[in-house]
Curated annotation (Swiss-Prot):
Enzyme class: oxidoreductase
Annotated gene: ldh
Gene Ontology molecular function terms on file: L-lactate dehydrogenase activity
EC code: 1.1.1.27
GO biological process: glycolytic process; lactate metabolic process
InterPro entries the record matches: L-lactate/malate_DH, L-lactate_DH, L-lactate_DH_AS, Lactate/malate_DH_C, Lactate/malate_DH_N, Lactate_DH/Glyco_Ohase_4_C, NAD(P)-bd_dom_sf
Species annotation: Mesoplasma florum (strain ATCC 33453 / NBRC 100688 / NCTC 11704 / L1) (Acholeplasma florum)
Locations listed in the record: Cytoplasm
Function according to Swiss-Prot or TrEMBL: Catalyzes the conversion of lactate to pyruvate.
PANTHER family: L-2-HYDROXYCARBOXYLATE DEHYDROGENASE (NAD(P)(+)), L-LACTATE DEHYDROGENASE
Name under which the protein is recorded: L-lactate dehydrogenase
Upper classification of the organism: Bacteria, Bacillati, Mycoplasmatota, Mollicutes, Entomoplasmatales
Length: 317
């Protein structure tokens, strides 16, 4: 009999993970959810809390706290577990602790017999996605990093504010590391179908404005962490959008973490690039013809990620 429902397992029931689940149940992402956390009481409490929405929301679902055994027949696993980023700490400085955590999670999921798609948002996202895929040996297409989805959403909002248009009217994207070395691919940016260069030529936005938008986009997490200790709503909604594209086989373009195998002149690790998302994960990496400056910046970002991945391998050896 053909399966007619989707099962999603969340590993890590902190603020990011539960923001994703809250977004998911509100938008009817799946019919079954399982929460896994090293703190089983927290997982149980969160499951009960979400159960209290079942009589109000339109689309039916079940949710419970579970174990890695529940991964066996899951369609999608979303991993948000890990030590949180401290004020002033870069994502890459999280590497040793969270690499060891990710290795344990990967081994437990692999042992369950899971055969679906995994989406990873734990930081440093690009490196930990690479660690997970290497430890599990899963097909690289079935492992998806959150990549620069959130970074790009931030950039689109900031550029939209400068031009006084809706964020959805802006197609401007950030590539590379989900973090400080990322690259704003303005050469490919459009606003309401027009290249951003047209708005520059007309004086509606300046190069300084674009530089400010990019700088603020990559520093936004630090601004939020300084004020409230953590970021979670934005990434939670982004994770739901990524998950929806996978479960519904949308063939949508996203700036997620995909493993490079020669694309953009890089190889052997995950980073944020434009891809087509479908039911099997990321299907195709789209290679943009970047400007020379963007190519150089992307290479620099990839070099930093590769060096950090080598440190991650040492941490889990």
């Amino acid at each position: 009999m053909k399966k007619t429902s989707n099962k999603v397992v969340l590993v890590g029931t902190g603020a990011v993970g539960m923001s994703f689940i809250y977004s998911a149940v509100n938008q009817g992402l799946a019919e079954e959810y399982v929460l896994i956390d090293v703190n089983t009481k927290a997982a149980e409490g969160n499951a009960i809390d979400i159960q209290d929405t079942m009589a109000v929301l339109d689309k039916p679902f079940t949710i419970k706290a579970g174990t890695y055994e529940d991964c066996k027949d899951a369609d999608l696993i979303v991993i948000t577990a890990g030590r949180p980023q401290r004020p002033g700490e870069t994502r890459l400085e999280l590497i040793a602790d969270n690499s060891r955590i990710m290795k344990g999670i990967a081994e437990a999921i692999k042992a369950s017999g899971f055969n679906g798609v995994t989406v990873i948002a734990s930081n440093p996202c690009d490196v930990l996605t690479t660690v997970y895929q290497q430890v599990t040996g899963y097909d690289e297409h079935s492992v998806v990093g959150a990549g620069t989805t959130l970074d790009s959403a931030r950039l689109r909002r900031l550029v939209a504010e400068k031009l006084n248009v809706a964020p959805k009217s802006v197609n401007a994207y950030i590539m590379g590391e989900h973090g400080d070395s990322s690259v704003a691919a303005y050469s490919k940016a459009t606003v309401m179908g027009q290249p951003i260069s047209k708005y520059l030529a007309e004086g509606k936005i300046t190069e300084a404005d674009l530089e400010e938008c990019w700088t603020r986009a990559i520093r936004m997490a630090y601004e939020i962490i300084e004020r409230k200790g953590a970021t979670y709503y934005g990434i939670g909604v982004c994770l739901n959008a990524i998950s929806s594209a996978i479960l519904r086989d949308e063939k949508t373009t996203f700036m997620v973490g995909a493993k490079l195998n020669g694309e953009y002149g890089q190889k052997g690790f995950y980073t944020g690039v434009p891809v087509i998302l479908g039911s099997k994960g990321w299907e195709t990496i789209i290679e943009w013809d970047l400007s020379d400056a963007e190519k150089a910046a992307f290479k620099k970002s990839c070099d930093a990620l590769d060096a950090t991945y080598q440190k991650a391998k040492e941490a889990i050896a």
